[in-house]
């Protein structure tokens, strides 16, 4: 019994001891593992910091090297130019001195002989005949010596100090005037004395030539300057507080040598002190759509095209209540626009030898509503229409046409939308011509001249009418095929012209008139779009619009239309838009937008048959809208009871330079919302950020993008103010990203025989949550480089290939300042 108990005690004790040891050992092992892990983590963090530091140093070194290299290159270039100018100046001075030296030799020889003969006559009475003979012989010898010395001196001076002749001649003239006889006696001495004197002043002419060759540039202390660069067409933009400069685009192979269009748009909202301007060029519509900014801008032209284009358009509108003035002008080949509260200038379009037929710039517009802090950004490519369609925005559109293209284009567009509550109606844009009527009691627009066997059958129409009984909101929009001329302000104006090409538009005589008046708000809006040209009159009592470029055997049948409708049940917001023949597809949802373009190329899209459907349903704010645009055609339907949009064929030697414009502005009395938008045909340059903007380029190359086939989609959903809208527009390509406040734009390189099948898409998404509405949009033509953030900016270039844009050097500047809201 005892033994068994003892054994039991021992066994239990041993087991307890083992359990205790096992527990302690497990604890210690865990502690060791944790310590090892901590050491590893610390080492890893240390190594990662080292790596980051190394990469940072490398980045700084590379950045410094890049900056130094750029400065060195500029310094070398400047030194080379300066040395070349100085050398040219010295050559000119040497030539002048040689000519003067020849004249001086002849004068000195004649003078010395005359003085010697006079002295001989005086000495006749005193000297005998023998002395006379001797004196004559001596004098003759002296004169010969003097002449020889003068000649030798002149030769030596010409070789050594060719710049002293002028002063020598002056001294001789002074001696002649004084009439002193000492010149005859001391001719040798005088000639010797003149040498050192001339040598003393020999350096003065060189200093004068250097001073003449210098160039100085001085900027005033208060002068604000902003520069920006845009490729293909190149859209140079500067969008500062109040100023504006736009600017130049070099032209290539005998192109756009004379293009000089102008456009101006200004709009002001007394409540928010908001100014909005917009412009759309035919080849390019560069736009800046900030609180008060603006941008316009480019149009591509082709070989033997627009070489003499010189259209002008003026629009002026004045609203006695708000003191609003708006002017606008758009050339076909170029749409020059100035779109700032007070400033603007629009600009040039580069074109190349059979190049940039598809160039596509982008345009951005941004608007901010101080009450709701709303931001909107948008971008449209050349081939594509850059659009911004915010709470109350708009769209614009163009379609480029190419070599012998769109000769038979016959697209149509109709849009009819009716909102029983608000009685809203919007309508459309023609291909070759965009005929539009854009007012609550709107107007009819509409003619397009046709050219040498061109546009003989063009018959586009466009109507836009919108009425919002609750908010008294009115919106109009227009887009031409060749150009979309738009006026997008409560009382603003649009611009309008289209350059004409080879034996084109020589007789064009289109007219367009639109006048709208809202008795409550005293709002006037007019708009017009020509096919090759958008003829527009955009003022309460304004304007004439105007020209349409067409090409040799081009756009003979172009007839596209465009429609856009938007409904916002909560805010009673209405938006209308227009799309050109080339394609202006727009959708303007609760506050969104759509854009679209279609590039067409050599023997391309001759049979294009794209379709577009848009269906929108509003059921308890569950609104949805979709739309698509083909490359050859933009088919769109844009209404709750939507629409069909349509087709634009383009053909060989057609619409190569078509450029439409588009502008839209909408006001929401409750939220004081204003939005404008513009899209160029070849390029739509837009700036749509709180204060930033970029527009973007689309490179196109030799025989490139001939088969581009982009698509566009727009979908909008309004569910408890959760509105989303997307849109896509490729011309050759439409690259778009349109987030609530973000932006993505982007580049599309194209190469020789490249992007012939490019098919980019564009998305636009807009979200309204507690009135925090943001909309962004981007469209590249071949490429649309865009960045559209709430306040960001991206601009960007696309290099062009195959002997393209090698010399492009355009500049654009826009600056606007809003003192009240400090909006830029």
Swiss-Prot record:
Record field: transmembrane: none
GBP-type repeats, residues: 226-275, 276-325, 326-375, 376-424, 425-474, 475-524, 525-574, 575-624, 625-674, 675-724, 725-774, 775-824
Residues spanned by motif PEXEL motif: 84-88
Main location as per UniProt: secreted
GO annotations of cellular component type: cell surface; extracellular region; host cell cytoplasm
Tree of life domain: Eukaryota
Subcellular location: Secreted; Cell surface; Host cytoplasm
Function: Involved in merozoite invasion of host erythrocytes.
Subunit structure comment from the entry: Interacts with host glycophorin.
Name of the featured protein: Glycophorin-binding protein 130
Annotated organism of origin: Plasmodium falciparum (isolate 3D7)
